[in-house]
Regions:
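Short hydrophobic/aromatic-rich motifs at helix boundaries and adjacent loops
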Residues: 39-42, 66-72
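Active-site-proximal helices and loops of the catalytic beta/alpha 8
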Residues: 2-8, 68-70, 74-79, 85-170
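Active-site mouth loops of central-metabolism enzymes
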Residues: 51-64
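Core domains of carbohydrate- and sulfate-ester-processing enzymes
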Residues: 1-51, 150-170
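Short N-terminal helix-initiation segments at or just after the protein's N-terminus
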Residues: 23-28, 55-56, 128-133
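Generic alpha-helix detector with strongest preference for long hydrophobic helices that associate
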Residues: 35, 42-46, 50-53, 74-82, ...
């Protein structure tokens, strides 16, 4: 990848011998009995070959991402960010980044894409989540995309009949 030609540090990106794609096993991020190998590959594997995975456990990377976000907020007078694939990031790193941004800009909104279809799983990533608190974790994320609601709307508005078990009445 072209970004590897002049890295600021040797560990700026997650690197493996050969290409390693994420296994997309997001539930490993909060399952205390989940496989540590699966959790690491979910967080550290690349999402796709064209998107190198930044090593957010590297303090220099995290500082760069924070400064870059602040620059964009100031330069473009932004009110919020949508963070794609929020739950694939280094869990502690993304929480530090989110807290740094919201501490600096208390009214700034960050919406995290957590593409899961269960409210309990999605709520883990919400700021001050009682579920995440069980593991002493707080993402500091003000808003999480509600894919459970997305799924319901997709079904409701695409069903031909409206009765007790279909469509809007359901």
């Amino acid at each position: 990848h072209w970004m590897f030609k002049d890295m600021p540090t040797y560990d700026w990106f997650h690197q493996f011998p050969g290409y390693k794609q994420s296994n997309y096993r997001m539930t490993t991020q909060y399952d205390k009995n989940g496989s540590k190998i699966d959790a690491k590959l979910c967080m550290d594997g690349w999402f796709v070959p064209s998107m190198p995975d930044l090593n957010q456990s590297n303090p220099l990377v995290l500082n760069y991402l924070t400064q870059n976000a602040i620059w964009w907020i100031e330069y473009a007078d932004l009110d919020g960010f949508r963070v794609d694939t929020y739950s694939y990031n280094d869990k502690e790193g993304i929480a530090k980044w989110t807290k740094a941004i919201t501490d600096e800009y208390p009214y700034f909104n960050i919406v995290g894409e957590v593409w899961m279809h269960d409210q309990a799983q999605i709520s883990y990533w919400q700021k001050d989540s009682p579920i995440a608190k069980i593991q002493s974790y707080n993402s500091y994320l003000p808003s999480v995309m509600d894919f459970t609601l997305h799924d319901v709307f997709g079904n409701v508005f695409n069903e031909d009949r409206a009765d007790w078990s279909n469509g809007m009445i359901k």
